[in-house]
Design a protein with these regions (language model features):
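NAD(P)+-binding Rossmann beta1-loop-alpha1 motif at the extreme N-terminus of oxidoreductases
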Residues: 1-63, 88, 93, 124, ...
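Rossmann-fold dinucleotide-binding core
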Residues: 95-175
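Hydrophobic beta-strand scaffold residues
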Residues: 26, 46, 115-116, 157, ...
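Rossmann-fold NAD(P) dinucleotide-binding segment
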Residues: 50-115
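Helical "substrate-binding/catalytic lid" subdomain
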Residues: 164-288
Length: 300
């Protein structure tokens, strides 16, 4: 089966490697061609545009940063929508707004193309092993037709329903939880550190309790060492919080903690932490409190 992938960043490159590993004939496109080098070495085939990728594949996955990029890939002059292959199915892995998903799905339908939303949970290491969690909404027949491909990259698959954009709401809600947990853990670490307590002992105690999380277990020990190598950029977390806050208005709700989290991550980006891992919110808090976090990129 010929599968296409547009977007070979941190997540996309590992998803591509996984698809090649399990034997799919993979075509790839990325805005920056050099970022596909390793994938090509592993057997992937480069194409010059999303349109050409659509001509060659029966199923195209898109894994990009934001809604603007996704709409350009789908609806732009060389977009998937202009492919001659009207049997093409498009699966969107990107974390974008529900409204952008609805807009693109409607535009693709006018051209006789089918699509669905499939944002995923799990970082690049999880993607490499094919153990992502997939949250899916949209055309059920298209999903069923490509379920083997989906199962090759996801260990858990949740179908939210046929309404376009539903999966995006769930994804944003999940990322909001991650952002808030990251802030809470960061503030706790800073609090005990300023009290003269070894933060390593605090993390050990925390991880021995019922309240431990995968974040505290996997990220906590790195955070106290100022190790913020990006697996999910702080700037991308801010983008997701902005999407969530923007989507509150049509839902007619107010989520105060989410708004505060957005403001904190915005301030962290303004101080120069955007390209670090989202857990660098701890580094920002140290900076904000007049402490210089050692051994990492400093605020500006």
């Amino acid at each position: 089966m010929k599968v296409g992938l547009v977007g070979t960043g941190l997540m996309g490159s590992e998803i591509a490697s996984r698809l090649l590993e399990v034997g799919y004939d993979l075509y790839v496109h990325n805005r920056t061609r050099s970022k596909t080098g390793e994938i090509i070495k592993k057997g992937g085939k480069w194409v010059d545009s999303p349109k050409e990728l659509g001509n060659r594949c029966s199923f195209a996955l898109v894994c990009v940063t934001d809604g603007t990029a996704f709409k350009q890939i789908c609806l732009g002059n060389d977009g998937l929508i202009h492919s001659l292959n009207k049997e093409l199915v498009i699966g969107n892995l990107s974390t974008i707004s529900p409204s952008d998903s609805v807009e693109c799905a409607a535009a693709l339908r006018k051209y006789g193309m089918r699509s669905f939303q499939m944002p995923v949970m799990g970082g690049p290491d999880i993607a490499k092993k094919g153990e992502l969690v997939a949250i899916i909404s949209g055309d059920k027949n298209s999903i069923d037709k490509n379920i083997r491909v989906i199962e090759s990259i996801a260990r858990s698959i949740f179908y939210i329903g046929k309404i376009d954009g539903a999966a995006n709401y769930v994804k944003l809600a999940l990322n909001m939880n991650i952002a808030l947990i990251g802030i809470a853990l960061s503030e706790s670490i800073l609090y005990v550190t300023k009290a003269g307590i070894d933060p390593g002992i605090f993390i050990e105690i925390f991880n021995s309790t019922y309240f431990r999380t995968s974040l505290s277990e996997k990220k906590g020990p790195k955070m106290i060492k100022n190790d913020f190598e990006a697996r999910f950029h702080l700037g991308n977390m801010l983008k997701d919080l902005q999407l969530l806050v923007a989507s509150m208005k049509p839902l007619n709700i107010s989520l105060p903690l989410s708004v505060l989290a957005e403001q904190m991550y915005q301030a962290a980006r303004n101080r120069g932490y955007s390209e670090l891992d989202y857990t660098a919110i701890l580094a920002f808090l140290k900076d904000f409190n007049g402490l210089q976090p050692d051994g990492i990129k400093q605020g500006i």
